[in-house]
């Protein structure tokens, strides 16, 4: 397995979106930055907030695109190209409708599942889908016509607690990823479910 050199948290920019379910990926990167003691700062060259962090002695770039979600690939592509980071060395954290709040899972490759952020990243990586994802469960509204309003809405307090618990566990599992390997990180994270 390639070493992860870039961790991306997907989000929409602006205060009005900061607490919406669609920004769960960014919450994870913000928490990673906090435990690494680094500050995410705006960098127009990479169309996002970036930081250089050290996890278990290894250098990693953190990125939260400040483009809108459907243009996330612009930021990921710019940073990956500049630092010559391959898709296999990228981990993208995003909200996942098909998993309940309180659950998060790592995954390598796959489609975009209708997620506009993933869709644009795949396009900007020359259709290479072979990057890692951290899927953060937010649940599903039950009707596909309600998805847009749902992901752009705030989770009720109990659901928010579950999402945050899964993110905390994902951060701990990310430390295991750097200390040991992805298999051990997956084993830990995939057995977790916040209640």
Curated annotation (Swiss-Prot):
GO molecular function, one term: tRNA binding
Reaction equation(s) it catalyzes: an N-acyl-L-alpha-aminoacyl-tRNA + H2O = an N-acyl-L-amino acid + a tRNA + H(+)
E.C. designation(s): 3.1.1.29
Superkingdom, natural source: Bacteria
Residues annotated as binding tRNA: 17, 68, 70, 116
Protein biosynthesis found in the keyword field: no
GO cellular component terms attached to this protein's record: cytoplasm
Annotated site residue numbers, Stabilizes the basic form of H active site to accept a proton: 95
Location of the protein in the cell: Cytoplasm
Annotated site residues (Discriminates between blocked and unblocked aminoacyl-tRNA) in this chain: 12
Location of the active site: 22
Top-tier EC class: hydrolase
UniProt GO BP: protein quality control for misfolded or incompletely synthesized proteins; rescue of stalled ribosome
Primary localization class, coarse: cytoplasm
Keyword tRNA-binding: yes
Alphabetized Pfam families for the sequence: Pept_tRNA_hydro
Keywords linked to the UniProt accession: Cytoplasm, Hydrolase, RNA-binding, tRNA-binding
Protein family membership: Belongs to the PTH family.
PANTHER family: PEPTIDYL-TRNA HYDROLASE (PTHR17224:SF1)
HAMAP family, alphabetized: Pept_tRNA_hydro_bact
Quaternary structure, from the entry: Monomer.
Functional note: Hydrolyzes ribosome-free peptidyl-tRNAs (with 1 or more amino acids incorporated), which drop off the ribosome during protein synthesis, or as a result of ribosome stalling. Catalyzes the release of premature peptidyl moieties from peptidyl-tRNA molecules trapped in stalled 50S ribosomal subunits, and thus maintains levels of free tRNAs and 50S ribosomes.
Protein name: Peptidyl-tRNA hydrolase
The organism of origin for this protein: Shewanella putrefaciens (strain CN-32 / ATCC BAA-453)
């Amino acid at each position: 397995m390639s070493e992860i050199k870039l961790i991306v948290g997907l989000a929409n920019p602006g205060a009005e979106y900061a607490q919406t379910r669609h920004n769960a990926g960014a919450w994870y990167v913000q928490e990673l930055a906090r435990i690494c003691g680094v500050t995410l700062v705006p960098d127009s060259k990479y169309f996002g907030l970036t930081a250089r962090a050290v996890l278990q002695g290894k250098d990693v770039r953190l990125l939260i695109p400040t483009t809108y979600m459907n243009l996330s690939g612009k930021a990921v592509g710019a940073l990956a190209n500049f630092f010559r980071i391959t898709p296999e060395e990228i981990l993208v954290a995003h909200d996942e409708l098909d998993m309940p709040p309180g659950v998060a899972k790592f995954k390598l490759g796959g489609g975009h599942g209708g997620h506009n952020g993933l869709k644009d990243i795949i396009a900007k990586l020359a259709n290479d889908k072979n990057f890692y994802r951290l899927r953060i469960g937010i649940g599903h509204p039950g009707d596909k016509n309600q998805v847009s309003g749902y992901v752009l809405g705030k989770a009720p307090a109990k659901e928010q607690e579950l999402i945050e618990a899964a993110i905390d566990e994902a951060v701990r599992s990310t430390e295991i990823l750097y200390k040991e390997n992805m298999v051990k990180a997956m084993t830990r994270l995939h057995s977790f479910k916040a209640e």
